[in-house]
């Protein structure tokens, strides 16, 4: 533990507040809240942690804290800080999933529309609905019942909706505010309290039309009633009071948490939201943070009631959300919470089972690859690829796959030092020599298989260094590509021969992943090198800019493009003399 962190830990207050963990660059990587800052922050640096939390702690180079007057204030501050800084370890609610709502617009002549965006525009929102189809079906029903305006802008003459009785045509005829308000109130009543009253009214109108021998109107009303039943009775009644409520349940294990939210509208369960994410604090605290973010950051409409599982600080949530919050102990509401909890537990178990199955499948692919090649199982695979443009800025890269999975800590980058011009074979010899001479000197583990992104020539170059120069008997294979630059053949042996592999096999897919990854890594490194070289060359001809100032400019701007966008004042702010800044600015504008 760093000395300055030790000193900070000794003076932490025993008050509520938020803490901000930073990495070496000063970037905020995690934000948390605590009832007692002293206890919570110290817990990160003492005792044992799971691998996931240990990874977070390993990146902490410093921390700050903000004291608040209460736990609720700390919770609100935490959510605001997460929203502002978007720390990489605060990964709750990263998805962009949004649900459809029905909206009554706040206009002189209101419209009923479906939307996924909730805005503070004076409109009335109803939902959420499980999908766009359900929202549109309900809207279609209401359009048949209440002839509100349909057009976004009023046309010069009546449209089709007027002729089919679904619009009063305020574009041509006068529609009073009282008429609009009555329809808005009836739609609101329908969407908030259900369709039973509307159904009774329609039945009365249907019978009256039949008595008056207006059979066409009676048939229209009968069809509308049938359509209403088809739309509204698709959901099973869960609770009889028709209150809109959200039901929360959660489960946690092995450093992961699953939260499930059931949306109950008009007594019916219409949809659920599932979130699975890693957590680093106490489970109950992260659960509270999730609830706050769910409403305050994702803009979900707050319902009439929120149901929570036992052990949750309901009073704190009620204070935060300003809605009725309950922890039910019996009856239908308790059953709903229990179902949400059970579903959260099952979703978490399913996640772990899928991870385990994927790991088993990956290991199986490694074993099958060894069998196909006639070599011992290659648990550690190292792959190489070269990258250059007509011999300029030549580089090479190596990736390591252990048990079939990439291990990025073992990746290596190489600038080619001894080769001039575009010579792929000599570049391969240099890199293979540098890699394995070093491993031998340091007495480190050698790979079970070496993969070369190339054909027979590259394989021969690698084998020459390994077998003839270093006396190593590591198998070397090559991955040849077709005319569409896709992995097509596996080559092995001396001389290299094609190893038959089915293109849809797990082992072929593993090789494809390895080839794609080493190619990506090499290409990225080459672009960085080329950009840096160009950056340096631009500055070479500017008097007054030496190596120190080059590094300063590179660190500050990052690219020539950013430098070209800079003004002379931007250069002066870096303590560069005015004459040098003007020369640099003029040179960049001519590039």
Swiss-Prot record:
GO terms for molecular function: DNA binding; excinuclease ABC activity. Its main location: cytoplasm. The keyword DNA damage applies. One of its GO terms (cellular component) is excinuclease repair complex. Keywords: Cytoplasm, DNA damage, DNA excision, DNA repair, Excision nuclease, SOS response. InterPro entries: GIY-YIG_endonuc, GIY-YIG_endonuc_sf, GIY-YIG_UvrC_Cho, RuvA_2-like, UVR_dom, UVR_dom_sf, UvrABC_protein_C, UvrC. It is found in: Cytoplasm. Pfam families: GIY-YIG, UVR, UvrC_RNaseH, UvrC_RNaseH_dom. PROSITE patterns: GIY_YIG, UVR, UVRC. It comes from the Bacteria. One of its GO terms (biological process) is nucleotide-excision repair. Residues 196-231 form the UVR domain. Residues 14-91 form the GIY-YIG domain. Belongs to the UvrC family. Interacts with UvrB in an incision complex. The UvrABC repair system catalyzes the recognition and processing of DNA lesions. UvrC both incises the 5' and 3' sides of the lesion. The N-terminal half is responsible for the 3' incision and the C-terminal half is responsible for the 5' incision. This is UvrABC system protein C. It comes from Halalkalibacterium halodurans (strain ATCC BAA-125 / DSM 18197 / FERM 7344 / JCM 9153 / C-125).
